[in-house]
Amino acid sequence: MYIDFAIIDTDLDEKKAKEQISEVIVCGISSVTVPYYLIKTCKSLVNLNIQDLSCFIDFPLGISDTKTRSCAVEQAIIAGVNSVDISMPQNLATNRRYEKIREDIKAIKEVCDGKNIKIKYILEYRMFDHRCLKKICEIFDNFNINYVYPSTGFFLDNLADNLIASSFLHQNSKELNIVCSGDTWLEKHFDMISRSGIHGFRTFSPHVVKNFKKFMSDN
């Protein structure tokens, strides 16, 4: 199971961020995702040979233009990440500007090409209907974008709806690795995600990571 631990609390200081990441690293997580300002602080804690250190780009709303987003990706790579989490431009998706979405992805890929950078995209499933989500995932497939988060996890969310959206994308895009985002994970959610075939989950809580590891060892 792919487990991503993410920090989205901008009030979190560097010391606390290090403490949280140190807590989850020993649990064998797959990825750590942080804002740009925490990359250098956290880099020494992540084994880049076996784990992803990723940076949020244009998070959470995806409101910047392509040039700004590409520049942010370039700076994150220079800072030391081996992965980037890109927020889907909501205005493009809402207005079904699929060609513009392709242009945006192409520009991001050009920055990452040859640098062994994993590109992951973040959607906000509540903003788009299923037809739009499916079309966007087809575009991801065409660009060999393999990791998709159906939700930012930034806003108040219904985890059950999130899991339903994740399962829908998984069923319609078998080549994509769907990672479900959520804050409060209970055993019933762990059970649902384990049975669903979804690739993994993202959490913002070290406590959830520990609980999931215990759940897996007990089952």
Predicted regions and their residues:
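Glycine-rich phosphate-binding active-site loops on the catalytic face of alpha/beta enzymes
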Residues: 59-60, 79-93, 142-159, 183-184, ...
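Short, electropositive alpha-helical surface patch
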Residues: 110-113, 134-145
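Active-site-adjacent beta->alpha loops and helix N-cap segments on the catalytic face
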Residues: 34-52, 64-68, 91-112, 128-133, ...
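Conserved N-terminal beta1-alpha1 strand-loop-helix module at the mouth
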Residues: 1-78, 135, 139
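Alpha/beta catalytic cores of nucleotide-metabolism and tRNA/nucleoside-modifying enzymes
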Residues: 1-15, 167-179, 186-219
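Hydrophobic faces of well-ordered beta-strands that scaffold small-molecule active sites
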Residues: 1-7, 30-34, 51-59, 82-86, ...
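Catalytic cores of alpha/beta
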Residues: 64-78, 128-139, 169-180, 184-201
